[in-house]
């Protein structure tokens, strides 16, 4: 539906002359990323999803900036199980994984 492209192109200096009337629309970010990696064009993606591809040189970033999408990930579980150690271990593991991620260095635009 091109929401991410609209968010991106609203930033000054990034899209004054770009039309959203044409182009392919994919059902998932992953499909767009695969198409870009294969040389079919430019795609909007999630930095977490492309970090390894950028580090390995399979995908390039056209600009060193990222635009916040307003989307996020949440870990939830029932209140009654809040104190269970296995949920705390999962939470701690996920936080450690996120902290260890090597994301591309970009300026983040709100």
Where on the chain are the PLM-derived regions?
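A ligand-binding cleft/hinge motif common to bilobed small-molecule-binding domains
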Residues: 34-58
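Secondary-structure junction motif
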Residues: 1-14
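Short beta-strand-to-loop elements that line the ligand-binding cleft
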Residues: 18-28, 66
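C-terminal effector-binding regulatory domain of bacterial HTH transcription factors
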Residues: 47-56, 66-110
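Short coil/turn segments
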Residues: 1-3, 25, 65, 79-82
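Short active-site alpha-helical segment characteristic of glycosyltransferases
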Residues: 31
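A short linear hydrophobic-aromatic micro-motif
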Residues: 61-63
């Amino acid at each position: 539906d091109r929401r991410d492209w609209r968010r991106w192109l609203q930033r000054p200096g990034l899209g004054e002359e770009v039309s959203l009337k044409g182009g392919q629309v994919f059902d998932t970010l992953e499909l767009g990323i695969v198409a870009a990696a294969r040389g079919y064009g430019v795609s909007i993606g999630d930095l977490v999803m492309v970090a390894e591809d950028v580090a390995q040189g399979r995908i390039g970033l056209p600009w060193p900036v990222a635009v916040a999408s307003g989307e996020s990930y949440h870990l939830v579980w029932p209140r009654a199980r809040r104190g269970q150690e296995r949920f705390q271990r999962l939470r701690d593991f996920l936080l450690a994984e996120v902290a260890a991620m090597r994301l591309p260095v970009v300026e983040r635009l709100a």
